[in-house]
Amino acid sequence: MKKIFLTMTPLPYMNHLPENHYFLSLTVVISIIHLFTTCVPQHNHSTHFPYLNHARHLNHVLHPSHARHPNHVLHLNRVLHPNRVVHLNHVLHLNHVLHLNHVLHLNHVLHPNHVLHLNPILHPNHYLVSRYYPISRHYLHKIFRLFM
């Protein structure tokens, strides 16, 4: 089996350049090659967005500014993907609309049939009236737009 050796001989047009300039050019070329071999996104969702998983068990704050792949749609102002079960243990941040005392904690599972299971069961046609979830009527249409 033949072995190929990479020689460090300068190219002919580089003979008149200083030695440090040649090694600087070589360093730039190696840096560019390293950049393309390590930073170019592969066709793998976890490489593009490491915080995305197929299992949508979220232990962090959801924020609408994060980029999300179309197959894992979870835009807070868009539609929840019907094939994903979303388990939210923390605060659902709706584009800074919910005031601090109007925070919606989802400790149960959002069912694919668009029924929001909380401590009291809430259908999108109903209003959530509870001292534990003090959400005003002004915010309800923004919340239910997620499930429609």
From Swiss-Prot:
Entry superkingdom: Viruses
Cellular component annotations (GO), alphabetically ordered:
host cell membrane; membrane
Primary residence: host cell
The name this protein goes by in its record: Uncharacterized membrane protein EP148R
Question: Keywords in UniProt for this one?
Answer: Host membrane, Membrane, Transmembrane, Transmembrane helix
UniProt membrane topology term: Single-pass membrane protein
For this protein, the parts annotated as crossing the membrane are 22-40
UniProt-annotated stretches for the region Histidine-rich: 43-141
Report the subcellular localization: Host membrane
